[in-house]
Amino acid sequence: MKLEELVRDIRAYRGVVRKGPITNVAAGLIPIQSEDVLAAYGEDAAVIKCGREILLMAADGILQDLVHRNPFWAGYCAVLVNVNDIAAMGGQSIAMVNVLSCSHEEVRARIVEGMRAACDKFGVPMVGGHLHPDTTYSAVDVAILGKTDRSRLVLSSGADVGEPIIFATDLDGQFTEGVPYSWDTTSKKSKEVVRRQLRTMNKIAPYLTAGKDISNPGALGTLGMLLEASGKGCVVDVSKIPRPKGVDLLQWLTAYQGCGFVVTCREARTKLVIDEFARSDITAEVCGTVTKGSVFELELDGDKRVLFDFSKDTLGCAPPQKL
């Protein structure tokens, strides 16, 4: 695939495009008047001071077409995306609540089954929520509470010029049937394996300067969010991004990863970070460098193109509120 086509298709990808409106919504809610809020918009979770601990709060909703297509997987993913958000911040998940909107009893039951399966898999309880049993639509949304400490807090907004960019992904998975952009690495693995993988970010957190889990915008879109939050640019060699054999490049770069992270660190910490990911069967490689400015550049087969220019483009992560 030519780089020009790749840039065009990623910029037009739904998971990327739908991030833009976040900026206007967040602008209406900033500034936050609380001395206990340490970081908010632009991060995977809000960061709240609570005594000696740091609390993490996040929420995610599931795309309506996924709820219609596969309600069990929608419920499962509603939990998965939240525990990944907490892990990406260097945190440990505590508990979740949900808002379930569905008038069809069978669909509702499948969504709940999916949530329960994921709660059991990741070891995070669902402790309450709210039900709309009479809506004209079906939707599931989950909010999560996590915790960490200051030495292990990983922000999206900490990347600095010259630092290596590391993509880390569990390549042992499969695309969910009927959901071509959902790379499932957790449903068929034991709870011991997936929980060990989630703990990896907490282990390496003191060595990272920034991090995000690879989510709906895909690998490059997620990195774009991190860079926008950090106020930086980058150069990335697409050919170095870990990818399973036989998987289409565009499909892979726009996939939601069951277990995938993009992180930055000091150059001296690179081997330590990559080796720690490897201990949890997560393949990690240096694929680029953080640069000064606002331009996100890609390289492939001798060609070089601009994917995003954050002086003009937004993925809903600028500026994050850090107090």
Show which residues each predicted segment covers.
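Acidic, Ser/Thr/Pro-rich beta/coil linker or hinge segments at domain junctions
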Residues: M1-L3, R14, I30, S280-L323
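Short, compositionally biased
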Residues: E177-V193
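Active-site-proximal betaalpha loop/short-helix elements
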Residues: K191-G258
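Extreme N-terminal cap/leader segments of soluble proteins
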Residues: M1-V67, M89, N98, R116-V127, ...
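Glycine-rich anion-binding loops of enzyme active sites
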Residues: I54-M57, I62-Q64, Q92-E177, T289-T291, ...
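Beta-strand->loop->alpha-helix junctions that form or flank phosphate-binding loops
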Residues: V37-A40, H132, K232-R243, I274-D301
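Small-aliphatic-rich amphipathic alpha-helix that forms the alpha element of a beta-alpha
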Residues: N70-V97, E113-K121, R196-P206, A219-M225
